[in-house]
C-alpha cells in the first residue's frame, strides 16, 4: 500500500548500520555453461540481454533497482532519497501499488475482508510486462489505481519513459522470480514492526479517513500474516538490507555511490562484475583509432599496440593480491606500502597472445611464461595442439594473454586446461585488448570466478565470427605475416 514519505520518531528502533548480504549482479543471467559450439546462439543471447552491446543504435539498457520491505517500512522515503542523489541521471519510480487488480462487485461488497497484501491482489503479469518494456528502452503507460473506488482509472494513465535508472517499489516486488531476475540491484528496507504499525495507523487515518480500530483489525488479520508469509521470506533475495529505512543516510549514500559507479560502466560490466574495462581516455581512444586504421604502417601498429597492451597488463596486475610492506626511505622515514604477489606467471595463447609477452616482461621482471596452441579453425576452436606450462602453475596466479576475445571458444579451452592443471578459477586473469560481447558471455557464464580485463568492448561478431568494428587479424598485423600473404 502507499506509504507516508515523511519521517517519524524512531526512538523505539535501535538497529544501526547497513547490512550488505553481497552484490549478486551475476544473478541476472543463468550460470549454466553455454553451448560453445553454437556461436549463433551466443549472438542471440547478446542481442536479447544487452541490446546496446551489439547495436549502436539501440537504447542503453537501464539500471533496474527493486525496493521491497514491509508496509510503512520507509520504502518510498528511501526511493526519494536515491532519486534526489541521482539528480544528474534520469530516474523513474514505478510503484507496485499501481498494479492492484480492480475489485469485482462481490469483492467490493466485502472490501473490509479483502487481503490487499496477498500476491494475488496484484496483476503481476502486467508488472512484468511493464518492467520488460522499460528495460528494452520503450515507454510504458502505468495504470493509476484509485484506493477509494478500488478500481483502475480507465481514462488516465501515467506515461513512464525510458530512463537511466528504473526503481520498482512494492511490498512484493521480489515475490515473482521473473520480475526479480530483471533487477540489477535488490534492496530490502528493514524496519521494526512497531514502527511500521505506528506509521500505518497514522497514514490510514489521516490520508484514507479510516478509524483506528479498522486499521488494527486489518493489520492483525491480513497485513501481519502476509508479511510473515510472503514479504519477510523475500528478504533472502536482497543484495542490500537497510535497517531503519530513510533514517539510515549512510546506507543510502553507499547505495547511490555504487549506482553511480555502475551507471558509468558498460552494460556487460553490470551483468558480470568480473569484467573490467580500463577507464577510457582520449589517449586510449586515440591509440585505438590508430591501430584500427587498416592503412597504418606495421611499425606504428606495433608501437601503439604495445602501449595499449602495457596499460592492460598494468591494470590486470592491479587485480592480484598484495600484502602490506614497510620500507625505510633515504630520508630515514618509514613508508607503508604493498608488496606484489610472488607466485605469478603468464600464459599466452599462441600466436597472437605472444604479442603481449614483451609488455608483461617489462612489468614483471623474470616472470615465467607458458604457451598454449589451439587450432581455431578445426573442431570449432577446441583442438588443443600444444601446451608448455610451468610445472608449479597450480600454485601461481595466471595472467592469460590473448589480444582479441571473439567467440570465446579458444579461451574456454585454454581456461579448462589451466583448471585441469590445478589452477583455481579465481586465480586466472584474462587480458585482452578488445572483446566481443559474445565472447564475454561465453567465458563469464562458464567461469564466473575468472576476471577479464580489456581496453574496449566492441559491438558484435559478424557472420565470419570476426569482431566488429575490430582490428582485423591481430597476429598477422603485429608480426607482419599479412604482408607475406599478399
From Swiss-Prot:
Function: Involved in the pyrimidine salvage pathway. Phosphorylates uridine to uridine monophosphate (UMP). Phosphorylates cytidine to cytidine monophosphate (CMP). Does not possess uracil phosphoribosyltransferase (UPRTase) activity that catalyzes the conversion of uracil and 5-phospho-alpha-D-ribose 1-diphosphate (PRPP) to UMP and diphosphate.
Reactions catalysed: cytidine + ATP = CMP + ADP + H(+); uridine + ATP = UMP + ADP + H(+)
GO terms, biological process: CTP salvage; regulation of starch metabolic process; UMP salvage
Protein residues bound to uracil: 472-474
Record keyword Cell cycle present: no
EC nos: 2.7.1.48
Keyword list, A-Z: Allosteric enzyme, Chloroplast, Cytoplasm, Glycosyltransferase, GTP-binding, Kinase, Multifunctional enzyme, Nucleotide-binding, Plastid, Transferase, Transit peptide
GO cellular component, one term: chloroplast
Binding-site list for 5-phospho-alpha-D-ribose 1-diphosphate: 351, 376, 402, 407-410, 473
Expression sites by tissue: Expressed in roots, leaves and stems.
Protein name, per record: Uridine/cytidine kinase UKL1, chloroplastic
Organism: Arabidopsis thaliana
Transit peptide boundaries: 1-47
Domain of life: Eukaryota
GO MF, one example: GTP binding
One Pfam family matching this protein: UPRTase
Bias (Low complexity) ranges: 31-54
